[in-house]
Amino acid sequence: KQDAISILRGISIRMPLMIYGADVDNEDTQLTIDNFTSLIDPQSWDEFMPQGVTKQHFNHFKKYYDPDIFSAAAKRIRAMARAADRLSVEQRIQRITSIFSSFRNPDKETVLTPWRVVNMHLGDTLGGYNFFNDNYAATIDEPRFIDHGKPTDDVFRSDAHILEINSKSGLYPLYMAYGIYRARVKESMFAIETVDAEQRLWDKTVAE
């Protein structure tokens, strides 16, 4: 019994993050306890779920979850993410990182680095656009630029490409992508004045 409770607790802690990252092409499609495993890619499942808990194991344990409560929680998490899509890039980043801050670390070995720590780490080493004030006590509405000279210039070029092979939540690549995005805004031949224009350039930056 205790083993089953421990496994259920381990699964439950991880569910919100995995629901957030579920591969859902059509947001009108309801995410349910029955289709949950089919919407999570194998690599993410192996990375985040407790060791030894396969999709087959989950399907055995899913009978202990209330389907209606699961669907309602999933709908709320996905709605929070979708709402960010209608905001400016800066506001969207603030909203996304706020959502991530509500997720619990899956276990002692899998730590979701807080957004503040990401900004401290990359701000101190590479520079770029930082979302916290000078002493990292609070977020700021307009990101401040930290210039470390050549390292900053080399990394945050408009044509730079970032390979991040160990990202769990995606906050490190998010910081890097925003710096490259701002370089592209600066070099753009056309004024980026609408949310739609921002979104097109942001999507292109992330895709490349």
Residue ranges and their predicted role:
Residues Q2-A207:
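Class I S-adenosyl-L-methionine
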